[in-house]
Amino acid sequence: ISECDAGIFDAMNKGIKLARGTWINFMNAGDFFSDTSILERMKEYLIKSKADIVYGSCYRYHPFYSYVKVPGNLDLLKKGMEIPHQASFIRGAVQKKHLFSLRYRLAGDHDLFLRLYLQGYSFEYVPVLVCIFSLEGVSNTRLLEAYKETYLVLTKNKVADLKSMNSKLKYVRGYVGCLCEMMLPTNLKWKLKAMKKELADKTKTNRRY
């Protein structure tokens, strides 16, 4: 279908309502499956799975900084977006019951996954590199808006309380961090991100030994 909508999540909701398949996956402009055999490979897992949401890893791409994101502990959803919707497959019956909230322009997918997690729906990780995800999308270029919406998601779902001083301080620190990041030249910003991740990976490796 091609028609006016109230944003990306409104358009995705329209697709959900029309979908007739057992599983639903959304791949946005600029993102794509990691190779042409992914759907066949995922089919093997989806047929056997008893979970409500099945997800894999994704390759996050930027000209200055690229890496494979393997989702961690689901409790991290209480802090931010941990599972890219491009790498996830949600049962159609579940997705139709829980549409994306139109309250958000950027963080609607985070809100959906957090709601499903808090309501006890089952998640299953599978060792498949599902998609290639562009880091030049709106959630990475509109940092302040994305950050504000993340905190709205957390407060709405009652995993953060901006009335507490501790939460307020965390929010302010994060907000200032976004402002500083926006002032950096693009290539420097992504090079610093790459260095930070490399250091974090080395720290994890050292802890194992």
List where the protein language model places each region.
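Conserved nucleotide-sugar donor-binding catalytic segment
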Residues: 56, 66-149, 153
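Active-site acidic Asp-centered loop
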Residues: 3, 27-29, 107
